A protein has these predicted regions:
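Bacterial N-terminal signal peptides
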Residues: 6-17
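Alpha/beta-hydrolase fold active-site loops
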Residues: 55-56, 139
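Conserved redox-active cysteine motifs that mediate thiol-disulfide chemistry
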Residues: 60-77, 100
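Thiol-based oxidoreductase modules, predominantly thioredoxin-like and allied folds used
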Residues: 86-102, 117-126
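Short, internal strand/loop/helix patches
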Residues: 106-144
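Thiol-/selenol-based redox modules, centered on thioredoxin-like
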Residues: 143-186
């Protein structure tokens, strides 16, 4: 055991700085204000003050992203389920015009028409994505409680089998943010 101690200390020194520097993203006043500045693609203009003290879901997506399609269905289901609880769902469009995807300007409109989101959809979110921990993978979803602390953070990892957050996972995160038991029933 004594021989392993230097190795263990070295391992802690190598691993501890990244763990200590990892910042938990919260939905603070600056992030709420930045979200409110984004153009509304679907729904009404967002009011930052209306997000104060509420459970807020923030989902980053692009219309060309295959996992974002079923995730939008789950966001719609969450909207129907939790609307009476005052939950706000915001979908933030990022990476829409990159690479070969910039050649189809009508793709986003077709996506929104097909998915018919019953929640706020905001455009031009690249700068806001930086405020949420440099979102560089989609879909990425956060659920924030009324205090602004996250109860769920999902990132679609490259090559992962799990490609998007399920309705059940959203429901557990939202219920935790609401202070309710984590059951997944409607």
């Amino acid at each position: 055991m004594r021989a392993l101690r230097p190795l263990l200390v070295a391992l802690i020194v190598l691993v501890a700085p990244p763990l200590a520097s990892a910042e938990t993203v919260t939905l603070d006043a600056a992030r709420r204000a930045a979200l409110a500045e984004l153009p509304a693609l679907q729904g009404t203009k967002l009011n930052a003050e209306a997000l104060d003290g509420r459970v807020v879901v923030v989902a980053f997506f692009a219309s060309w992203c295959p996992p974002c399609h079923p995730e939008f269905d789950n966001l719609n289901a969450a909207q129907r389920t939790f609307q009476r609880d005052g939950v706000e769902i915001l979908a933030v469009n990022i990476f829409e015009r990159i690479g070969r995807f910039k050649d189809d300007p009508g793709r986003l409109d077709r996506f929104l028409k097909r998915k018919a989101p019953a929640f706020h959809v905001l455009g031009d979110g690249e700068a806001v994505a930086e405020l949420f921990g440099s979102v560089d993978r989609i879909p990425t979803v956060f659920v924030f409680g009324p205090d602004g602390r996250p109860t769920l953070h999902f990132i679609h990892a490259r090559g992962a089998r799990k490609t998007h957050v399920s309705f059940e996972e959203l429901a557990v995160g939202i219920r935790a943010a609401l202070g309710a038991p984590p059951s997944v029933g409607g």
